Amino acid sequence: MKTSMQAKLDQLTTRLAELNDLLSREDITSNIDQYRKLTREHAELQPVVEQYGLWRQTMNDAATAQELLSDASMKDFAEEEIRASRERMETLESELQKMLLPKDPNDDRNIFLEIRAGTGGDESALFAGDLLRMYLRYAERNRWQVEMMSASESDLGGYKEVIVRIAGEAAYSKLKFESGGHRVQRVPATETQGRIHTSACTVAVMPEADEIGEVEINPADLRIDTFRASGAGGQHINKTDSAVRVTHLPTGIVVECQDDRSQHKNKDRALKVLAARIKDKQYHEQHAKEAATRKSLIGSGDRSERIRTYNFPQGRLTDHRINLTLYRLESIMEGDLDELIAALVSEHQAELLASLGDAD
């Protein structure tokens, strides 16, 4: 293990001991905000320090076995013990490296998932509906909560654009690599000649901004229009101006919400989506220079970048960023995304490790 890495782990071990002392103090436990902050830090450090403890114990086992080599009757046992200990130390060190990787501050946030139909007309809108269903099934598997924020349905079903809020543990960390262009190849229901058509949708995954102060929005920068909701009809449709369109004048970002009968609720939802879009725009602008100097294999999350192809005739999904092909499209469209997401996370971790190695 590198000296710098061991020094860092020693610092974390000391800090965990400090936290144990702090969390037992009455003045800390009576301060709810401070107590929560320290408890969160403790929860992050404890598994790292425990892993480091296993590494040190294994190193001590190897040192003890080394001393036995001079004893002829114990030599074979000692050599096997040394070999096993070194293998275990390598595994533990590799795991520790991943645990020390810089944590994305957005990983624990809830998200807004936006799907837009692209090229392909009605078929693209139908595929947008299929993608939404896939993500909703995945959310169910993770016991996340889903709230429809805005939906613009197409004439034949599916969506021209749809935005949902997904709330739950690690939602952003698991879905953040879904941003980009998703291409579908299949025979549309309206195709009489059996020809395969290609269409596309774009997906954007945006971390939800904090309620207070994270994204400053000056009310003077907003234009808020109300209009009558459009939809499939019904007694409440088009009788009141409940739909809301919010335009952020400095950026030109426009958000429409009309799913609720309450204008107030639609406005509140639109402002939440707007804050997430502004935060997302700021994030990508900040990382533009870095992306230009070191092109990430996973990609920047730019929705114009084609990241994946869904080939229905072959039952095949291909993620172009990591050259991964899976021949179980049916289960994937039912929300079985674990293998795919794990592969993307693993590749991202490998990239981070490589970049840290370059920095050393």
UniProtKB/Swiss-Prot annotation:
The modification N5-methylglutamine is found at Q235. The keyword Protein biosynthesis applies. Methylated by PrmC. Methylation increases the termination efficiency of RF1. GO terms for molecular function: translation release factor activity, codon specific. Disulfide bonds: none annotated. Gene3D superfamilies: 3.30.160.20, 3.30.70.1660, 6.10.140.1950. Pfam families: PCRF, RF-1. It is found in: Cytoplasm. It comes from the Bacteria. Peptide chain release factor 1 directs the termination of translation in response to the peptide chain termination codons UAG and UAA. HAMAP family: Rel_fac_1 (MF_00093). Belongs to the prokaryotic/mitochondrial release factor family. This is Peptide chain release factor 1.
